[in-house]
């Protein structure tokens, strides 16, 4: 075993994913520095395990968190100081690839050709560099653009159980931002199932978001730190994905989409790491640094003069308790919420975005304009009235309603169906060509429905269409039989 020099130390203790390393006097590495050690239990490569300095214990000892398995490490092994934080490859060479927390490819397609690397720990853009203009981020998805518009450079919370269409919605957003804005997307799989990560990769290949034959034509990068990884990897993988997105925003001046699935697992991993480091837990057993860690991640996701990173974050709510410190801390940073409803999937409305539960900070006449705001509120009012009447309809039937209420119900059912939309990424399953609907067309379509311009058309004409003209055409075809 090599004798330690000024840039290397020796392992003195290994407790699970926590490794203590002793350095010669005066050679202690800074906090967040990446150290490397050869772990023969992982594979035959040298320096194959990265550990990150988290604490200075005194007596020239650094306490570190491992980014991979520590099985196979023994006391006395030599640890090399890399002199820099964990850095990941960036640039167009990473498009279409699956990377892990330290930027190594895990898709068995050879090494990443990128020559540039970005550190995963970076300061948030300064106030001077940030873009203060509040503008909506058009997605081309009617229900989102009308009722819960996304803020460019904002953070959106995505709520929904299993099988309600989170993945398909994410892929449609990736597709639309690439085709309409020339932007790329980065997907961070944080502490979720490996099987789901694999499914997503293959679905992206099928839908054309990742081009397997020519990776340079891909629109997305996948960065995974899944459930089976040590907590160090799960606590850092979101930062690795963010560094890749920051490169495209700052150096290539692109609009980026950053998906984090799941932001709760980021907090959960931080809690595990905190306990292993011996910190005294805070409320409900979470780490005392919960707000700081969340803030350091979220403040880097913003709009600058170069471009914007708009983030969509899936949020798991433990035991459906919205006051739990983990989701509650994430809520403080959100600009909009998109809630997916199982009831809508049961009646075949896709995307199953709940029009009454989803919210947005920028649905304000000063931001989106008076007409957009007015139409959105009228749509919600109509749907809310329909919801209130559903009990009466279930007990007494439609005939017992007043004429006004019958009209409201008819319009609400048309609105509900018009909120559905065929997706490009689902084309090969449904046979319906996908539709991107411009915001102006969305507003006009819903305005005409709530004003009663299309009261004579059957409600099925509004199902799975793009703009209102398409619904009118569909009605003509239905009438012609």
From Swiss-Prot:
It is a peripheral membrane protein. Its EC number is 7.1.2.2. Gene3D superfamilies: 2.40.10.170, Bovine Mitochondrial F1-atpase, Atp Synthase Beta Chain, Chain D, domain 3, P-loop containing nucleotide triphosphate hydrolases. The keyword Nucleotide-binding applies. Its main location: membrane. Pfam families: ATP-synt_ab, ATP-synt_ab_N, ATP-synt_VA_C. It is found in: Cell inner membrane. ATP binds at residues 160-167. SMART domains: AAA. It comes from the Bacteria. Keywords: ATP synthesis, ATP-binding, Cell inner membrane, Cell membrane, CF(1), Hydrogen ion transport, Ion transport, Membrane, Nucleotide-binding, Translocase, Transport. GO terms for cellular component: plasma membrane; proton-transporting ATP synthase complex. GO terms for molecular function: ATP binding; ATP hydrolysis activity; proton-transporting ATP synthase activity, rotational mechanism. PROSITE patterns: ATPASE_ALPHA_BETA (PS00152). The keyword Ion transport applies. It catalyses: ATP + H2O + 4 H(+)(in) = ADP + phosphate + 5 H(+)(out). HAMAP family: ATP_synth_beta_bact. Belongs to the ATPase alpha/beta chains family. F-type ATPases have 2 components, CF(1) - the catalytic core - and CF(0) - the membrane proton channel. CF(1) has five subunits: alpha(3), beta(3), gamma(1), delta(1), epsilon(1). CF(0) has three main subunits: a(1), b(2) and c(9-12). The alpha and beta chains form an alternating ring which encloses part of the gamma chain. CF(1) is attached to CF(0) by a central stalk formed by the gamma and epsilon chains, while a peripheral stalk is formed by the delta and b chains. Produces ATP from ADP in the presence of a proton gradient across the membrane. The catalytic sites are hosted primarily by the beta subunits. This is ATP synthase subunit beta. It comes from Anaeromyxobacter sp. (strain Fw109-5). The gene is atpD.
């Amino acid at each position: 075993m090599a004798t330690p020099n000024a840039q290397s130390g020796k392992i003195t203790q290994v407790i699970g994913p926590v490794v203590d390393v002793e350095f010669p006097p005066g050679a202690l590495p800074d906090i967040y520095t990446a150290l490397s050690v050869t772990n023969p239990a992982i594979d035959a490569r040298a320096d194959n395990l990265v550990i990150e300095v988290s604490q200075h214990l005194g007596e020239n000892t650094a306490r570190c968190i491992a980014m991979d398995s520590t099985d196979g490490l023994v006391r006395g092994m030599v640890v090399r100081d890399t002199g820099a934080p964990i850095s990941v490859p960036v640039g167009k060479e990473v498009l279409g690839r699956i990377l892990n927390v330290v930027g190594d490819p895990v898709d068995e397609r050879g090494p990443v050709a990128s020559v540039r690397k970005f550190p995963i720990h970076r300061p948030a853009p300064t106030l001077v560099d940030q873009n203060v203009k509040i503008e909506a981020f058009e997605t081309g998805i009617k229900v989102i653009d009308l009722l819960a518009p996304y803020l460019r450079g904002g953070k959106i919370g995505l709520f929904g159980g299993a099988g309600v269409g989170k993945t398909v919605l994410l892929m449609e957003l990736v597709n639309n931002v690439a085709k309409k804005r020339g932007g790329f997307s980065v997907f961070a799989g944080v502490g979720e199932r490996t099987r789901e990560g694999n499914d997503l990769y293959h679905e992206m290949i099928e839908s054309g978001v990742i081009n397997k034959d020519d990776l340079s034509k891909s629109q997305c990068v996948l960065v995974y730190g899944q459930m089976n990884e040590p907590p160090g990897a799960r606590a850092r993988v979101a930062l690795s994905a963010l560094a890749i997105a920051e490169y495209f925003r700052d150096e290539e001046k692109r609009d980026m989409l950053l998906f984090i699935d799941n932001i709760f697992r980021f907090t959960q991993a931080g809690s595990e790491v905190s306990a292993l480091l011996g910190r005294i837990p805070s409320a409900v057993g979470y780490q005392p640094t919960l707000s700081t860690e969340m803030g350091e991640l979220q403040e880097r996701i913003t709009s600058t003069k170069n471009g914007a990173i708009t983030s969509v974050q899936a949020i798991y709510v433990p035991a459906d308790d919205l006051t739990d410190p983990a989701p509650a801390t994430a809520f403080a940073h959100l600009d909009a919420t998109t809630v997916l409803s199982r009831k809508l999937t049961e009646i075949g409305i896709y995307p199953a975005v709940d029009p009454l539960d989803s919210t947005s900070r920028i649905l304000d006449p000063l931001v989106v304009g008076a007409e957009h705001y007015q139409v959105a509120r009228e749509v919600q009012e109509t749907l809310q009235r329909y919801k209130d009447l559903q009990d009466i309809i279930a007990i007494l039937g439609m005939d017992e309603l007043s004429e006004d209420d019958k009209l409201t119900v008819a319009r609400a059912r048309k609105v509900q169906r018009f909120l559905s939309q065929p997706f490009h990424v689902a084309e090969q399953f449904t046979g319906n060509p996908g539709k991107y609907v411009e915001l102006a067309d969305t507003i006009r379509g819903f305005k005409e429905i709530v004003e009663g311009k299309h009261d004579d058309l059957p409600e099925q004409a509004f199902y799975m269409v793009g703009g209102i003209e398409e619904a009118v055409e569909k009605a003509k075809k239905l009438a012609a039989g």
